[in-house]
């Protein structure tokens, strides 16, 4: 970041914040390469993603040389004019992927610089992980049971690709970079569908994930500007204010350029935003708005959101996309869980002298359930079982070594079990464990051309059991039975805050 900031400081007077020349710098592609390695899909090894050869230094140098020779073709290119386009012709997938990844790194620079300056001005401790998943779970535990209404909101999608370009104009004041952005948007014509609320970030193509991730975040950044009035002084990873729930790449700079716009148009409705009982949380394309207020207040918020998105951002949002429900009678799907607030009724007997009383009490309890049908559907899509949940062998892994097969199955199970350990009922996790364990056994038996029974008898079922429950054994060592009985780990809800994203298999609806 210091190198990028220095570059902009040196050339600020003569280039007017031009970011386009950075495409000709080799370290940009090195940064994109490092990000690709750190953000790989959790159940695939690095070599399967193609990063080892595609992002090598030699290929980056060849790409830069070719761009120097055909600089004008990068911007004025037409997707249909393949004869004039040698840049995207023979190595279209390779070079286009590298340029899009490098371009995503470059357009993030203005956001990053504003983030650093904001952190320095406010003297807030820097954190490498300011993502909503770290604060949403404590919010669910501490606050949700005290609220009355919740609204399910789907982030609207732009009706035209040019809106995405116009959104970035206030951040990127570089005409060549904006033209290049238009080129990528039209080259990947399916990007419009990737921004739709029904699509998730995890469904983005592996080759251009960072590019579309940046576009998605910038789009949602604008959509969430309506909630800027909910913010109080910035908090640092606390679940008591709206600021901690925003899943932003650049966290503390939200209000700098967004506060002025809505005030001019919605002065009469500013009182709506000062309700201290409003809570907003979002992950990817889905968000919730919860309140302790009345149903009328939620209806006013619904009307405001629809009009704000339609008339200010030209985003089509149908009113029926925002559902208002009572928490005590409704469960909502969010962050890979079905969440609800239930009333636990109990009777307390009280005795005073010779008189006794029966007191009916009700306690609100927050419950989370892992969705078994979507999880089995995800496992079936990945060929671990059929649609009925019956385990099958993973034939494409049969050529791998035994240790590699065990490691892959073990990693998938630990990731799913790790994340869904917050479920109130563990029977669903036992079902997932059974599917993956038997699928692993069938895969190994197929490799050795034997039956599952024969293979398990030779290998020993305890080895598979020990491998797939390694995390539970670690917990039993950390918490002795005298102070934290091991059986409670199967009954207690545990949130692991070191998870920075929902795994692909845990994120399908």
Swiss-Prot record:
Main location: plastid
Highest rank taxon of the organism: Eukaryota
GO cellular component term of the entry, any: chloroplast
Record keywords: Chloroplast, mRNA processing, Plastid, RNA-binding, tRNA processing
GO molecular function: RNA binding
GO biological process: mRNA processing; RNA splicing; tRNA processing
Keyword Plastid: yes
Residue pairs linked by disulfide bridges in the UniProt entry: none
Localization in the cell: Plastid, Chloroplast
Described function: Usually encoded in the trnK tRNA gene intron. Probably assists in splicing its own and other chloroplast group II introns.
Family listed: Belongs to the intron maturase 2 family. MatK subfamily.
Protein name, UniProt field: Maturase K
Gene: matK
């Amino acid at each position: 970041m210091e190198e990028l900031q220095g570059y902009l400081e040196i050339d600020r007077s003569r280039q007017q914040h031009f970011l386009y020349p950075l495409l000709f710098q080799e370290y940009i592609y090195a940064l994109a390469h490092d990000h690709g390695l750190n953000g790989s899909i959790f159940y695939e090894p690095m070599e399967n993603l193609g990063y080892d050869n595609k992002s090598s230094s030699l290929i980056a140098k060849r790409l830069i040389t070719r761009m120097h020779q055909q600089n004008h073709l990068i911007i004025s290119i037409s997707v249909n004019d393949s004869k004039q386009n040698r840049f995207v012709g023979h190595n279209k997938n390779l070079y286009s992927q590298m340029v899009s990844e490098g371009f995503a790194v470059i357009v993030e620079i203005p956001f990053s610089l504003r983030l650093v300056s904001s952190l320095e001005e406010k003297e807030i401790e820097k954190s490498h992980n300011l993502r909503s998943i770290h604060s949403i779970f404590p919010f669910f535990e501490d606050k949700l049971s005290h609220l009355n209404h919740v609204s399910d909101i789907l982030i609207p999608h732009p009706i035209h690709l040019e809106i995405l370009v116009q959104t970035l104009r206030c951040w990127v004041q570089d005409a060549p970079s904006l033209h290049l952005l238009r080129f990528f948007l039209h080259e990947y014509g399916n990007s419009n569908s990737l921004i739709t609320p029904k699509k998730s970030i995890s469904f983005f193509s592996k080759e251009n994930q960072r590019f579309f991730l940046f576009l998605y975040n910038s789009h949602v950044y604008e959509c969430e500007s309506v909630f800027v009035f909910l913010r109080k002084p910035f908090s640092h990873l606390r679940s008591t204010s709206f600021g901690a729930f925003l899943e932003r790449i650049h966290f503390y700079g939200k209000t700098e350029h967004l506060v002025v716009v809505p005030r001019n148009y919605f002065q009469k409705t500013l009182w709506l935003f000062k309700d201290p009982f409003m809570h907003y949380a979002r992950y990817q394309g889905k968000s919730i708005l919860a309140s302790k207020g009345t149903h009328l207040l939620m209806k006013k918020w619904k009307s405001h959101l629809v009009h704000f998105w339609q008339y200010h951002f030209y985003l089509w949002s149908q009113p029926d996309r925002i559902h208002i429900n009572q928490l005590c009678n409704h469960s909502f799907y969010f962050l890979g869980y079905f969440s609800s607030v239930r009333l636990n009724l109990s009777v307390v007997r009280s005795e005073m002298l010779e008189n006794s009383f029966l007191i009916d009490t009700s306690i609100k309890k927050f419950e989370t359930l892992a969705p078994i049908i979507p999880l089995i559907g995800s496992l079936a899509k990945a060929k671990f079982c059929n649609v009925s949940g019956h385990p099958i062998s993973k034939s494409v892994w049969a050529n791998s070594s035994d240790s590699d097969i065990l490691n892959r199955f073990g990693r998938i199970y630990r990731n799913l079990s790790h994340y869904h350990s917050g479920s109130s009922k563990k029977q669903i996790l036992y079902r997932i464990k059974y599917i993956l364990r038997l699928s692993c056994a069938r895969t190994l038996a197929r490799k050795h051309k034997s039956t599952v029974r024969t293979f398990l008898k030779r290998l020993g079922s305890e080895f598979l059991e020990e491998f797939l429950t390694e995390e539970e054994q670690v917990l039993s060592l950390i918490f002795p039975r005298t102070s934290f009985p091991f059986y409670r780990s199967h009954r207690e809800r545990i949130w692991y805050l070191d998870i920075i994203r929902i795994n692909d298999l845990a994120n399908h609806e």
